[in-house]
């Protein structure tokens, strides 16, 4: 079986050619995944957590330095089936949100694949990622959800694996691997191709941010190189809008060295240009396109001294960028600050699910909140 072997729940079952997805019979409907019994859980030692401790609550930050815009409002929706963080940043296809991999239930290499249906306010179980990992990069295009790289250990040991999930058949296939291992990269679709930007690579012991910029062609199953991101960084926010790619925020190696940098990639010239920086310097935030603006929410910052958080911040700020005026403004913050969230737009709402409730990976969240402008 070659690298395009079809994977159903992680098992190779048939050889696959470039157009074979459409030939596969459709599976039964995805099964409902019951909601988590508690909003949080611990990575170490296990166990659900119903309330944050005062010291954990103190990490929450809500105030933005940006000028005020329309408030908007947040609502609480069905929680994830279990508390999760450090998963793929989330992507949407056909009106549903897909959240893949990450930390959960005491492990950092989960293969979870949960799908949210806004019409029923239910989470569904989909075929798991063939190999569990955290900080996987994901993007959706032409009926498939693509997953690239990730870490096998806790924010360490990057991977080269790449997979495509066929939404119509609930099955994964192996596609051309990354040329170099990396996790916490950003994946975004532009003109039918998937750009994989930034992230962190080897060595395992001393994780290092990278500015690598590679482009995957789904038709040819091939990778090509493009101009590197200025300022190698990971845990960025990344979206494509109006023919350009925006890369905003992130970190240089660790959350102690976050940045507010904002660059756009101009594909026709294979070059990068600077734009107005993000008002709140952060990494591990969500970034989506909503009503012709770029909305950033969540994230983290701080210092870890021998594993103990110092100056820890978990952000609730919601800020939006107007590409026409190159300006930012603030909106109502997330009620539950989190980082490493899954964020996607479904209909006229921004959905933010899961994420870390405290600095680092100690506490996962099942919280699911949605934002809309009046």
Across the structure, where does each feature detected by a protein language model lie?
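N-terminal export signals
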Residues: 5-23
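Kelch-like beta-propeller repeat domains
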Residues: 24-374
């Amino acid at each position: 079986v070659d690298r395009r072997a079809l994977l159903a729940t992680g098992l190779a079952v048939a050889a696959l050619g470039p157009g074979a997805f459409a030939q596969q019979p459709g599976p039964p409907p995805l099964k409902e995944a019951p909601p988590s019994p508690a909003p949080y859980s611990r990575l170490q030692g296990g166990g659900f957590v119903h309330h944050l401790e005062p010291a954990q609550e103190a990490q929450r930050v809500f105030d933005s330095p940006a000028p005020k815009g329309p408030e908007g409002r947040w609502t609480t929706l069905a929680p994830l089936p279990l508390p999760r963080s450090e998963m793929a940043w989330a992507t949407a296809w056909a009106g549903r949100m897909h959240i893949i991999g990450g930390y959960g239930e005491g492990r950092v290499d989960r293969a979870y694949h949960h799908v949210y249906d806004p019409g029923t306010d239910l989470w569904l179980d989909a075929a798991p990622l063939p190999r569990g990992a955290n900080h996987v990069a994901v993007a959706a295009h032409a009926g498939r959800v693509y997953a690239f790289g990730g870490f096998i250990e806790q924010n360490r040991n990057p991977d080269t694996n790449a997979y495509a999930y066929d939404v119509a058949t609930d099955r994964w296939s192996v596609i051309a691997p990354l040329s170099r291992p990396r996790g916490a990269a950003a994946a975004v679709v532009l003109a039918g191709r998937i750009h994989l930007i930034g992230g962190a690579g080897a060595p395992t012991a001393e994780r290092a941010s990278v500015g690598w910029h590679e482009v995957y062609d789904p038709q040819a199953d091939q990778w090509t190189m493009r101009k590197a991101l200025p300022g190698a960084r990971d845990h960025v926010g990344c979206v494509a809008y109006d023919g350009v790619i925006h890369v905003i925020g992130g970190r240089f190696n660790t959350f102690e060295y976050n940045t507010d940098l904002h660059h756009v990639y101009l594909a026709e010239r294979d070059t990068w240009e600077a734009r107005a920086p993000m008002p709140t310097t952060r990494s591990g935030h969500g970034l989506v396109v909503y009503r012709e603006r770029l909305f950033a929410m969540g994230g983290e910052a701080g210092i870890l001294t021998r594993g103990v958080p110092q100056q820890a911040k978990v952000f609730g700020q919601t800020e939006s960028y107007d590409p026409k005026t190159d300006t930012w403004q603030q909106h109502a913050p997330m009620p539950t600050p989190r980082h490493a969230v899954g964020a996607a737009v479904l209909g006229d709402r921004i959905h933010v699910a899961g994420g870390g409730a405290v600095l680092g990976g100690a506490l996962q969240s099942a919280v699911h909140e949605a934002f809309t402008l009046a």
